[in-house]
Amino acid sequence: MSFSFFRKAPKFWERRGPTSLLLWPLSWIYGLVLHARKLIQDTGFVKPKPAPVPIIIVGNIRVGGTGKTPIVIALAERLQQLGWNPGIISRGYGGKGSSAQTSPLQVKSNSDPTLVGDEPVLIARRTHDQFPIWVFPKRQQSIRELLKHSPNVNVIISDDGLQHSGLARWPAREGGRDIELVVRDERGEGNRFLLPAGPLREPATRERDATLFTGKIKSDDHQIGLQDEYFLGRRAFSLLSNLGKPYQLNNPANTQTLTQIADSYLPNKITTVAALGNPQRFFDDLLKNGIAGKTISLPDHATYTPEFFTKLNAQCILITEKDAVKCSAIMDECIWVVPMSLALSDNLAEWLQSILQRPDPYRYTL
């Protein structure tokens, strides 16, 4: 059951009503399948071989984007500052080659996003190819290839993969040194139903080592306080993102501030386009910075053509960096790319460090 069944997240995912209740029996069946898979995994009949280095899994239980990619970038950069040599693996969502792919592919900043996916190329570009990045649906194979070509890597960050049973892990909460991070945005768990009646891949109470909050927090969410350090009995950390200085798509050296854009163009001459799992967050962030105008949300991983932008008839078109990797061949001077950065708190970095420094638990088991 896939999010791709819906072009966009349906409204009934946010609040329980007739449609979600009508679909609930399918969600119940989906839940049974999840439970059966977990039982098989727990019995050990199918046991993947663990990686020789710690794994940090950055995922979500809600389908669609919750802001994982900026977190992966921030994690890799912060871990490097702490003296680690991180590598990154991903399934390669959005890449047309993933289904026909027979072996892992290494991703560089000049890789074709239609083959390896939008996010991996974005990560490579933002980090200037500092970290080895490999993509393949079977993440265990990606790990083997990554370590084969980059034996100095001593920690691996998995962009998504919480639900990937083939990715062996010994979670920190159970005494291991692998870390499962659940990213949660302002939408929370919606109506808290599993697919397709709700937006959840797994139950809302799924175990995790920590929860990372992104975006604004709803004032009526009694489970979260501004000073809370725990969520569902585990550590929780709030991450704040900032929009950077937009740069021209066909001339990245040409930049201007969001304030300059707001002062230079009338709102009816500005169009913002986003193909994200949660585009409204991008639109809201721009509005906070004084950027009003028309907004267009497209399905996650949508592709673009020059004709699409021409038909917008806008003097200024704003897009995300994720969308920009798919627009390399488009030479429209009206398009400006808005970068987004995210910094990890010292508390989060220290907590990660304390777990990653644990001895390999597999060395002490029979």
Curated annotation (Swiss-Prot):
Q: What EC identifiers does the entry list?
A: 2.7.1.130
Catalyzed reactions: a lipid A disaccharide + ATP = a lipid IVA + ADP + H(+)
Give the species. Polynucleobacter necessarius subsp. necessarius (strain STIR1)
Q: Which NCBIfam families match?
A: lpxK
Key words, A-Z = ATP-binding, Kinase, Lipid A biosynthesis, Lipid biosynthesis, Lipid metabolism, Nucleotide-binding, Transferase
An example Gene Ontology cellular component term from the record?
plasma membrane
From the Swiss-Prot or TrEMBL record, give the protein name.
Tetraacyldisaccharide 4'-kinase
Q: Which GO terms describe its biological process?
A: lipid A biosynthetic process; lipopolysaccharide core region biosynthetic process
The GO molecular function terms of this record are: ATP binding; tetraacyldisaccharide 4'-kinase activity
What does the sequence similarity comment in the record state about its family? Belongs to the LpxK family.
SUPFAM superfamilies in the cross-refs: P-loop containing nucleoside triphosphate hydrolases (SSF52540)
Which pathway does this polypeptide act in? Glycolipid biosynthesis; lipid IV(A) biosynthesis; lipid IV(A) from (3R)-3-hydroxytetradecanoyl-[acyl-carrier-protein] and UDP-N-acetyl-alpha-D-glucosamine: step 6/6
Query: Sorted alphabetically, which InterPro entries does this protein's record hold?
Result: LpxK, P-loop_NTPase
Instruction: Kindly list the positions annotated as binding ATP.
Output: R62, V63, G64, G65, T66, G67, K68, T69
Specify the enzyme's EC class, one word.
transferase
Q: What does this protein do?
A: Transfers the gamma-phosphate of ATP to the 4'-position of a tetraacyldisaccharide 1-phosphate intermediate (termed DS-1-P) to form tetraacyldisaccharide 1,4'-bis-phosphate (lipid IVA).
- PANTHER family, alphabetized: TETRAACYLDISACCHARIDE 4'-KINASE (PTHR42724), TETRAACYLDISACCHARIDE 4'-KINASE, MITOCHONDRIAL-RELATED (PTHR42724:SF1)
